[in-house]
């Protein structure tokens, strides 16, 4: 999907966000205090976002301040796919409540089409959205991702320490996976 400010969320603006209305009709508001997103900490960054998204709002809005943040790529599946495109992501994330916040857990597979003494898997029988929609010989569900829906932070965990491909990714990207 093309990036657009209409798909992004601004946080830390000068106005409150509407959360919900109480049974008595009172509007409850709040302000984002998370660390997710990209800080709009200077005019140069605001101009860069205006150019990137083709929108003037970051430059002309009275609501954007140096403390404002832009959160884009908010879809949890798209977010992890951009972060780790070399993994194959299951299309069925599931929500959990962790520390009072909604977080999504996603399964990821390491795969290869080059593994000794193995034969190609028949992918015709796999369900749609399995994340395994390509030719492979080797596949393991070795990685889990946890995406915080409030601030967008993503934590990747290797859950199968015996997977040599996951270990190679961990060596190649030492700061990507959480211990």
Provide a role label for each language-model segment:
Residues 1-179:
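Soluble extracytoplasmic regions of secretory-pathway and membrane proteins
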């Amino acid at each position: 999907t093309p990036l657009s400010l209409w798909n992004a969320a601004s946080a830390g603006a000068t106005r409150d966000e509407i959360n919900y209305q109480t049974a008595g009709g009172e509007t409850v508001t709040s302000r984002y205090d998370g660390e997710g997103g990209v800080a709009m900490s200077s005019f140069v960054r605001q101009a860069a976002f205006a150019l990137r998204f083709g929108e003037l709002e970051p430059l002309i809005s009275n609501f954007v301040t140096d403390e404002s943040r832009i959160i884009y790529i908010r879809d949890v599946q798209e977010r992890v796919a951009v972060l780790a495109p070399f993994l194959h992501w299951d299309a069925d994330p599931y929500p959990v409540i962790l520390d009072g916040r909604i977080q999504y857990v996603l399964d990821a597979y390491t795969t290869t089409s080059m593994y000794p003494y193995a034969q190609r898997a028949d992918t015709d029988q796999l369900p749609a959205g399995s994340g395994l929609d390509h030719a492979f010989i080797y596949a393991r569900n070795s990685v889990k991702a946890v995406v915080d829906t409030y601030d967008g932070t993503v934590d990747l965990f290797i859950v199968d320490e015996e997977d040599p491909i996951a270990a190679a990714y961990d060596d190649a990207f030492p700061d990507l996976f959480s211990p």
